Amino acid sequence: MASTSLLKASPVLDKSEWVKGQSVLFRQPSSASVVLRNRATSLTVRAASSYADELVKTAKTIASPGRGILAMDESNATCGKRLDSIGLENTEANRQAFRTLLVSAPGLGQYVSGAILFEETLYQSTTEGKKMVDVLVEQNIVPGIKVDKGLVPLVGSNNESWCQGLDGLSSRTAAYYQQGARFAKWRTVVSIPNGPSALAVKEAAWGLARYAAISQDSGLVPIVEPEILLDGEHDIDRTYDVAEKVWAEVFFYLAQNNVMFEGILLKPSMVTPGAESKDRATPEQVAAYTLKLLRNRVPPAVPGIMFLSGGQSEVEATLNLNAMNQAPNPWHVSFSYARALQNTCLKTWGGRPENVNAAQTTLLARAKANSLAQLGKYTGEGESEEAKEGMFVKGYTY
């Protein structure tokens, strides 16, 4: 354990704690040092953004009982892959038609508290000429926006990636706020088969922290998402070890950047074996490992944990979420799903106008199932075989 003097002398790490196998965030210097450091951080955070009260209110609204997030922020290229799967061309009109179907589903706001949009969607209108943002707000759904600019190779790493998009982020987030967005999302990834290297983990954590600070300064609640990819043959213990170290580093840099924890949301991966592992985990095992991770690494000041599905089947993602809500948690534990909400809906629609109502009914059924899972009341009865099919894609890009 490092001494207090070492912590004071080295406020900025020049060598990742990943390498040392320790986390500065959870060290315990003298009580006086903790009080002074916390007091200084608290004062800095409150003064850093004039949106502090609004950020807390927005985060609590999204983290409301029985509701979660609809992630519909796929890039136009990824949206094109989805459309291609049902025989449609990747045109703005077709993207608009599917997004209209999603945001205008009657009663969606009963189960969904927030919707993450791609930039095109934030400025887009429905096929009826109404702004997508306005349609969401009318359903009591908070509009959000994807702000990262995607993954690029991380030079000097073991074939790993880093997330770009910090350049110009302050002006973009300010514009997104004016357009009606109230929260933001930044997705970076960690690959277990490729290490992960200390460099990749530190880069991911630092980028998330800078994005979070900038977003809060513009009035947007940042969703912090270091996705640990499902790729690999590793067991659940290996996933846990990596996740524990990743989240330690993330929170260390969030604190360094004076990010207000009450005004953020997390979007973690569930702790599962690698998708190519011979071992499979039950929902109870996934819940046990995941909740242990959260309790060891996530401060209770964070209002909401909104899990990503990461290629799990629709049913698997819902069952795992339900298992995590069988006992009280210090945070709102819910969902932020894309494919695990949209997949069956997309196939039901098939690009045909006459199928819109049926597709919306399918979307609502999936959203309701996850709403029940957030309350710990999902039974899994009546699920189709299609909803049980896994959606893992090796090397998946978003």
UniProtKB/Swiss-Prot annotation:
CDD domains (UniProt xref): FBP_aldolase_I_a
GO cellular component, one term: thylakoid
Modification after translation (UniProt): Can be trimethylated at Lys-394 by LSMT-L. The methylation level has no influence on the ologomerization state or on the kinetic properties of the enzyme. Phosphorylated on tyrosine residues in response to abscisic acid (ABA) in germinating seeds.
Bridged cysteine pairs (disulfide): none
One Pfam family matching this protein: Glycolytic
Site (Necessary for preference for fructose 1,6-bisphosphate over fructose 1-phosphate): Y398
Tissues/organs with expression: Highly expressed in rosettes leaves.
Induction / repression: By glucose and sucrose. Induced by drought stress.
Modified residues (N6,N6,N6-trimethyllysine): K394
GO molecular function: fructose-bisphosphate aldolase activity; mRNA binding
Residues at the catalytic site: E225 (proton acceptor), K267 (schiff-base intermediate with dihydroxyacetone-p)
UniProt-listed GO biological process terms: gluconeogenesis; glycolytic process; response to abscisic acid
Annotated InterPro entries: Aldolase_I_AS, Aldolase_TIM, FBA_I
Reaction catalysis annotation: beta-D-fructose 1,6-bisphosphate = D-glyceraldehyde 3-phosphate + dihydroxyacetone phosphate
Main location: plastid
Annotated knockout phenotype: Reduced growth rate. Unability to accumulate starch in leaves during daylight.
Entry binding sites for substrate: R95, K185, S309, G310, G311
Transit peptide location on this chain: 1-46
Alphabetic keyword roster: Chloroplast, Glycolysis, Lyase, Methylation, Phosphoprotein, Plastid, Schiff base, Transit peptide
Residues modified as Phosphoserine: S157, S215
Family membership: Belongs to the class I fructose-bisphosphate aldolase family.
Subunit structure: Homotetramer.
Function noted in UniProt: Plays a key role in glycolysis and gluconeogenesis.
Name of the molecule in the record: Fructose-bisphosphate aldolase 2, chloroplastic
Organism: Arabidopsis thaliana (Mouse-ear cress)
Gene name of this polypeptide: FBA2
